[in-house]
Amino acid sequence: MKQLRLEPVVQVRGEINIPGSKSISNRALLLATLAKGTTTLTNLLDSDDIRHMLASLKQLGVEYRLSQNNTVCELTGLGGVISSDTAQTLFLGNAGTAMRPLCAALTLGRGEFTLTGEPRMEERPIGDLVDALKQLGANIVYLKNDGFPPLTINATGLNGGDVEIAGDLSSQFLTALLMVAPLAKGSVNIHVKGELVSKPYIDITLALMAQFGVQVINHDYARFEIPAGQQYVSPGKVLVEGDASSASYFLAAGAIKGGEVKVTGVGRLSIQGDVKFADVLEKMGADIEWGDDYIIARGAPLTAVDLDMNHIPDAAMTIATAALFAKGTTTIRNIYNWRIKETDRLAAMATELRKVGALVEEGHDYIQITPPVVLNTAEIDTYNDHRMAMCFSMMAFADCGITINDPDCTSKTFPDYFAQFASLKA
């Protein structure tokens, strides 16, 4: 197994242009596919999850051209639904942002589609989405365990009508349903059951749908009306914002050991909720400066926080390791959906934080972290989870440094993360 040793870093400074957002990249690729016209996507993320989406679209007959560095994609839309005369089997790795929306989109047309993935994907729930699609007439069969991939879709189109969907596990289910609703045979009325997690990710979805010319009436996130007879129309060009979750590591670095770290590609005008991570750093004591398309973090003594971070679940992971450098006990609450991500992130985070000496309480949907007087070096297991690897890079700011196991797992969203991280040394 590959290992990466991070030696202690005394101070950081620099500027990082953040790669494109995974969430925006895969949503925009699917909407461009369903749209009329040709769409040019710039600053597209070049990573495993996006490659799985692109490979599947190509297999389904979608035509596109990629630039040499894979960050500009010119895609010719189908002007409607995806259909296939032959049975198709699509392998989607561990890409939830490809599996969930494609599962929904493939019910719209005609054909037989089987969706598979890596072993971890078979442990990531999709039942809430499938239940909702079945209410609109979809024919979907599980091939192994009920509620989980792999699955086969026998597509004949989606009916309109009223549909209930659970919102308390993952916002990706609602996102997938929203994106396909305009192409159903009648108007769709979506009722959200339970607390809606990761609400800002729904805002990303709605903003992109509007960019492609579709209207959704949002009744305070409890009900969504999608009128029938709409069509996605390419806006011509779509600029993919930098990934705000990826920005969190560099902003935390600036807060802990700045110097001054500037991230570009996200800022005040971002449609991503994860930019609010910078507000949490500010609450902890960091000096934060906002521009329209940049954020600067400067170092200051950090103090612990006790916050509900349901709205920024991915970026909240970075607070867990930043807490090692804050005075007091940090509590991150309402984050049950960490458990159904690339790994059970609550269990994994608790295990690895204890290795470096932290006192950790792992609850059903919260984690509490008290840093030790002196941090220990350790070998950090990453669980094939890109965010675990990136979060624990913060341990480079301890006097002992850290060893990261399987550092290449960052290829899911940020293949050259550690090279960029190393560039910050003052």
Swiss-Prot record:
First-tier enzyme category under EC: transferase
Main location: cytoplasm
Catalytic residues identified in the record: 314 (proton acceptor)
Organism superkingdom: Bacteria
Subcellular location as annotated: Cytoplasm
Reaction(s) catalysed (UniProt annotation): 3-phosphoshikimate + phosphoenolpyruvate = 5-O-(1-carboxyvinyl)-3-phosphoshikimate + phosphate
The keyword Magnesium belongs to this UniProt entry's keyword annotation: no
Known role: Catalyzes the transfer of the enolpyruvyl moiety of phosphoenolpyruvate (PEP) to the 5-hydroxyl of shikimate-3-phosphate (S3P) to produce enolpyruvyl shikimate-3-phosphate and inorganic phosphate.
HAMAP family cross-referenced by the UniProt entry: EPSP_synth
Name by which UniProt lists this protein: 3-phosphoshikimate 1-carboxyvinyltransferase
